[in-house]
């Protein structure tokens, strides 16, 4: 099936849309930082990094960011993350060498956590350290540690993914879902919600099973949406190694179009469960937790809006196109309104545990 033949259904997402009112001004500062950042070595790289429109992305996650500086530096991590993903994870010299990537990931993570660490071997490392220094300047120690843990989780998932690719191994759907919760990079942006708003969620709230389930479900919905967003570009480039569609095709024998339909049904069932658990948890939440839960909602919707327009996914040429500002079409109802846990996915079946609703 060719790129033009695949039919991607509209996204079901009846959640609130919002964007920080000063996102455009903040992005001007972000792009100036990119122009001088050591993570980019050519003008073409800088152009494609800017084409991720990462301030627009995170301004939709945190439309209530407390200050422009908080939005700037959290958005700059998103710019950094997409660039690192493109040049060190999905492509480049580490993309099929798990041992080499694991060593790089260890150095990157230590540089994030230790302000005294020095490593000039890769331009991404000093760029990340500059961002981390700003996080420490305005975040609480706990917020910074939570972000570091989320960052480590992401790198572990990417290592898992690269290991599969190097071995020519296609995971089953249950394993893929477990891996994608990490490798999709959803943990760091949601951990940055606290850094952006300045509100620290008490540990007894953030670590509650229902809240952890909501965080994981938000990550999974966004991850499956990103598989959708990137499908046409991956088909055009022949890079369909590990996404939800290739996994379903391998496991079930479905053709691509039917795999798209099956993945859409799974995604919508997760979103419906997210909404049900959210509506039980939110009424009793204090300010900090309520703000975080709203951030999860903003993040799901914002990721969908951004992904449907961003040149990172839509541009197939060597030069990115402008941001697509055309009106978006949304599905009016879910592709599957079954409220039970999907079969064959024990790794996430606990999201449907009735105990989560006993808040």
UniProtKB/Swiss-Prot annotation:
It catalyses: (2E,6E,10E)-geranylgeranyl diphosphate = (-)-spiroviolene + diphosphate. Its EC number is 4.2.3.158. Mg(2+) 3 binds at residues 226, 230, 234. Its cofactor is Mg(2+). InterPro entries: Isoprenoid_synthase_dom_sf, Terpene_cyclase-like_2. It comes from the Bacteria. A motif (DDXXXD motif) lies at residues 85-90. GO terms for molecular function: metal ion binding; terpene synthase activity. Binds 3 Mg(2+) ions per subunit. The keyword Magnesium applies. Substrate binds at residues 180, 233, 312-313. Keywords: Lyase, Magnesium, Metal-binding. Mg(2+) 1 binds at residues 85, 90. A motif (NXXXSXXXE motif) lies at residues 226-234. Belongs to the terpene synthase family. The Asp-Asp-Xaa-Xaa-Xaa-Asp (DDXXXD) and Asn-Xaa-Xaa-Xaa-Ser-Xaa-Xaa-Xaa-Glu (NSE) motifs are important for the catalytic activity, presumably through binding to Mg(2+). PANTHER family: BETA-PINACENE SYNTHASE-RELATED, TERPENE SYNTHASE. This is Spiroviolene synthase. It comes from Streptomyces violens (Chainia violens).
């Amino acid at each position: 099936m060719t790129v033009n033949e695949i039919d991607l259904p509209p996204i079901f997402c009846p959640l609130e849309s919002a964007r920080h009112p000063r996102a455009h001004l903040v992005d001007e500062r972000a792009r100036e930082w990119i122009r001088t950042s050591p993570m980019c070595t050519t003008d073409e790289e800088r152009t494609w990094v800017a084409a991720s429109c990462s301030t627009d992305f995170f301004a939709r996650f945190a439309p209530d960011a407390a200050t422009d500086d908080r939005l700037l530096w959290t958005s700059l991590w998103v710019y950094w993350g997409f660039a690192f993903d493109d040049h060190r994870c999905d492509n480049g010299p580490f993309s099929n060498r798990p041992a080499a990537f694991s060593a790089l990931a260890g150095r990157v993570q230590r540089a994030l956590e230790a302000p005294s660490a020095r490593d000039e071997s890769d331009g991404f490392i000093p760029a990340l350290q500059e961002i981390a220094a700003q996080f420490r300047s305005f975040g609480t120690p706990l917020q910074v540690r939570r972000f570091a843990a989320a960052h480590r989780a992401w790198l572990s998932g990417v290592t898992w993914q690269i290991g599969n690719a190097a071995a020519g191994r296609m995971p089953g759907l249950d394993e893929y879902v477990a891996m994608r919760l990490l490798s999709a990079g959803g943990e760091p942006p949601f951990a940055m919600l606290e850094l952006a708003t300045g509100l620290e969620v008490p540990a007894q709230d953030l670590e509650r099973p229902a809240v952890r389930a909501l965080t994981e479900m938000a990550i999974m919905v966004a991850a499956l949406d990103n598989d959708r967003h990137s499908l046409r570009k991956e088909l055009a480039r022949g890079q369909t190694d590990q996404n939800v569609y290739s996994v379903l095709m391998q496991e079930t024998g479905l053709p691509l179009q039917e795999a798209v339909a099956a993945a859409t049904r799974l995604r919508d069932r997760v979103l419906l469960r997210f909404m049900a658990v959210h509506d039980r948890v939110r009424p009793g939440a204090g300010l900090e937790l309520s703000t975080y839960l709203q951030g999860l909602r903003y993040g799901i919707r914002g990721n969908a809006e951004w992904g449907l327009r961003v040149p990172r996914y839509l541009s197939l040429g060597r030069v990115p196109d402008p941001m697509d500002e055309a009106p978006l079409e949304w599905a009016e109802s879910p592709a599957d309104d079954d409220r039970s846990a999907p079969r064959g996915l024990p790794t996430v079946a606990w999201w449907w545990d009735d105990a989560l609703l006993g808040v």
